[in-house]
Amino acid sequence: MSDKNNDLKALRHSAEHVMHQAVKELFPAVQLAMGPATDEGFYNDFDSSPEGTDPVLVTEADFVKIEKRMQELIKLDLPITRHELSEAEAYKLFADNPYKLEWVDEISKKGEKITVYWTGKPGEKNSMADLCRGPHVESTGKIKAFKLLSLAGAYWHGDEKNKMLTRIYGTAFFSQKELDDYLHLMEEAKKRDHKKLGQALDLFTFSDLV
């Protein structure tokens, strides 16, 4: 993978951290599960109906306020820093989140280092930590252009025997032009797919008998 692709993955991973922080701040009852960078952008899975709480309805209509909070966090140019924790420290930090504790157990069993990335200064206002291997950009201010794209359901660990979580997809780029170009390409691809589907279903041809 080229340096630029690595840099883009780090940027998108950081955008995902900003997104899940915004989601958690706006919907405090949700439990964050996991969220990687991908070839196309990033996503985050979260539990919107944790045991013992009333379900929280998060829809694409909420993207406007989530993106607004993300912009605020980006404008603050918060540092994103890596920290190594002991198993006990990780258990204390994520005591109220069974998904994170499951990850801590898995990491510990493998004998790997437990690392978290803090957005903002640990423990201060506008800060949040998440289990993560990284890498990330140095601060939220490096995120120049992003967009939340869609919402879907996803089973925990991709196993239908597990609980269905809520997944938000998004993407990020180094510039607004790159983001705009990407969104344009996606829109054109969607139109082509719609046209193909229409032709397959014969939606765009009409019988003289009708």
List where the protein language model places each region.
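Structural signature of FAD isoalloxazine-binding scaffolds in flavoprotein oxidoreductases
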Residues: P36-T38
